[in-house]
Amino acid sequence: MVSIVDDDRDITFLFEEALKSIPRITIFTFTDPILALEHFQINEYAYVLVISDYKMPGLNGMEFLKKIKDSNRFVRTILMTAFQIEDKVFNENTKKKIINAFLQKPVGIHDLVKEVETQLDAYEMQKKFPS
Protein backbone atom coordinates (compact mmCIF):
# COMPACT_ATOMS: atom_id res chain seq x y z
CA MET A 1 0.00 0.00 0.00
CA VAL A 2 1.11 3.52 -0.82
CA SER A 3 -0.44 6.63 0.69
CA ILE A 4 -0.41 10.13 -0.80
CA VAL A 5 -1.20 12.87 1.74
CA ASP A 6 -1.66 16.45 0.59
CA ASP A 7 -4.31 19.01 1.52
CA ASP A 8 -4.58 19.90 -2.19
CA ARG A 9 -7.04 17.41 -3.73
CA ASP A 10 -5.74 18.17 -7.25
CA ILE A 11 -2.24 17.04 -6.24
CA THR A 12 -3.48 13.78 -4.71
CA PHE A 13 -5.54 13.06 -7.83
CA LEU A 14 -2.67 13.85 -10.22
CA PHE A 15 -0.17 11.77 -8.24
CA GLU A 16 -2.58 8.86 -7.93
CA GLU A 17 -3.11 8.85 -11.70
CA ALA A 18 0.65 8.98 -12.32
CA LEU A 19 1.38 6.14 -9.91
CA LYS A 20 -1.21 3.85 -11.49
CA SER A 21 1.54 3.09 -13.99
CA ILE A 22 3.25 1.05 -11.25
CA PRO A 23 1.36 -2.27 -11.20
CA ARG A 24 2.60 -3.60 -7.85
CA ILE A 25 0.97 -0.99 -5.59
CA THR A 26 -2.42 -0.08 -4.16
CA ILE A 27 -2.81 3.67 -3.69
CA PHE A 28 -4.75 5.56 -1.02
CA THR A 29 -5.09 9.35 -1.05
CA PHE A 30 -5.90 11.70 1.80
CA THR A 31 -6.33 15.45 2.11
CA ASP A 32 -6.38 15.25 5.92
CA PRO A 33 -3.22 14.01 7.66
CA ILE A 34 -5.17 12.96 10.77
CA LEU A 35 -7.41 10.64 8.71
CA ALA A 36 -4.33 9.36 6.87
CA LEU A 37 -2.64 8.59 10.20
CA GLU A 38 -5.73 6.73 11.44
CA HIS A 39 -5.80 4.65 8.24
CA PHE A 40 -2.10 3.95 8.54
CA GLN A 41 -2.41 2.79 12.16
CA ILE A 42 -5.12 0.30 11.20
CA ASN A 43 -3.06 -0.99 8.23
CA GLU A 44 0.49 -0.12 9.31
CA TYR A 45 2.15 -3.37 8.27
CA ALA A 46 0.50 -3.35 4.84
CA TYR A 47 2.09 0.00 4.01
CA VAL A 48 5.27 0.20 1.97
CA LEU A 49 5.45 3.95 1.28
CA VAL A 50 3.90 7.19 2.55
CA ILE A 51 4.23 10.39 0.51
CA SER A 52 3.38 13.56 2.39
CA ASP A 53 3.24 17.27 1.74
CA TYR A 54 5.02 19.37 4.35
CA LYS A 55 2.59 22.23 4.91
CA MET A 56 -0.86 20.93 5.90
CA PRO A 57 -3.45 22.06 8.44
CA GLY A 58 -3.65 20.11 11.69
CA LEU A 59 -0.37 18.23 11.39
CA ASN A 60 2.63 19.20 9.28
CA GLY A 61 4.31 16.61 7.09
CA MET A 62 7.41 16.26 9.27
CA GLU A 63 5.31 15.54 12.38
CA PHE A 64 3.06 13.22 10.38
CA LEU A 65 5.98 11.19 9.00
CA LYS A 66 7.56 10.95 12.45
CA LYS A 67 4.34 9.38 13.76
CA ILE A 68 4.35 7.00 10.78
CA LYS A 69 7.95 5.93 11.49
CA ASP A 70 7.19 5.57 15.21
CA SER A 71 4.51 3.01 14.28
CA ASN A 72 6.48 1.17 11.59
CA ARG A 73 10.15 1.98 11.09
CA PHE A 74 10.31 -0.05 7.86
CA VAL A 75 7.81 2.00 5.86
CA ARG A 76 9.51 4.31 3.37
CA THR A 77 8.69 8.03 3.41
CA ILE A 78 8.86 10.89 0.95
CA LEU A 79 8.38 14.50 2.04
CA MET A 80 7.44 17.10 -0.55
CA THR A 81 6.99 20.84 -0.32
CA ALA A 82 6.91 24.04 -2.32
CA PHE A 83 8.52 25.86 0.62
CA GLN A 84 12.12 26.05 1.72
CA ILE A 85 12.85 23.76 4.66
CA GLU A 86 15.68 24.72 6.96
CA ASP A 87 18.68 22.51 6.09
CA LYS A 88 19.37 21.71 9.75
CA VAL A 89 15.81 20.43 10.31
CA PHE A 90 15.83 18.44 7.08
CA ASN A 91 19.26 16.90 7.74
CA GLU A 92 18.32 16.02 11.31
CA ASN A 93 15.15 14.22 10.20
CA THR A 94 16.98 12.46 7.37
CA LYS A 95 19.66 11.30 9.79
CA LYS A 96 16.97 9.95 12.14
CA LYS A 97 15.56 8.09 9.12
CA ILE A 98 12.19 9.82 9.39
CA ILE A 99 12.49 11.03 5.79
CA ASN A 100 13.85 8.69 3.13
CA ALA A 101 13.48 11.09 0.20
CA PHE A 102 12.52 14.66 -0.59
CA LEU A 103 10.71 16.12 -3.60
CA GLN A 104 10.56 19.85 -4.29
CA LYS A 105 7.21 21.08 -5.65
CA PRO A 106 6.25 21.44 -8.37
CA VAL A 107 7.05 17.75 -8.75
CA GLY A 108 7.44 16.41 -12.27
CA ILE A 109 5.48 13.21 -12.91
CA HIS A 110 8.58 11.41 -14.19
CA ASP A 111 10.49 12.41 -11.03
CA LEU A 112 7.63 11.22 -8.83
CA VAL A 113 7.35 7.82 -10.49
CA LYS A 114 11.13 7.35 -10.49
CA GLU A 115 11.41 8.21 -6.77
CA VAL A 116 8.49 5.96 -5.84
CA GLU A 117 10.08 3.07 -7.72
CA THR A 118 13.38 3.77 -5.94
CA GLN A 119 11.66 3.70 -2.56
CA LEU A 120 9.75 0.50 -3.39
CA ASP A 121 13.03 -1.18 -4.34
CA ALA A 122 14.65 0.10 -1.14
CA TYR A 123 11.77 -1.34 0.88
CA GLU A 124 12.27 -4.76 -0.74
CA MET A 125 16.02 -4.65 -0.01
CA GLN A 126 15.32 -3.57 3.55
CA LYS A 127 13.02 -6.57 4.03
CA LYS A 128 15.69 -8.95 2.72
CA PHE A 129 18.54 -7.38 4.69
CA PRO A 130 17.14 -5.61 7.79
CA SER A 131 19.65 -3.46 9.63
Q: Where are the regions a protein language model picked out?
A:
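Hydrophobic/aromatic residues positioned on beta-strands within the core alpha/beta folds
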Residues: 80-82
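Two-component/phosphorelay signaling modules centered on CheY-like receiver
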Residues: 9-28, 96
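Receiver (REC) domain active-site loop signature in two-component systems and cognate sites
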Residues: 56
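Active-site residues of response regulator receiver
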Residues: 53
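Acidic, metal-coordinating helix/loop segments flanking the phosphotransfer/catalytic sites
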Residues: 29-49
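Acidic catalytic/metal-coordinating carboxylates
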Residues: 32, 60-66
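Alpha4 helix (beta4-alpha4-beta5 surface) of REC/receiver domains from two-component response regulators
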Residues: 63, 84-101, 114
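Conserved acidic segment of CheY-like receiver
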Residues: 1-10, 15-16, 50
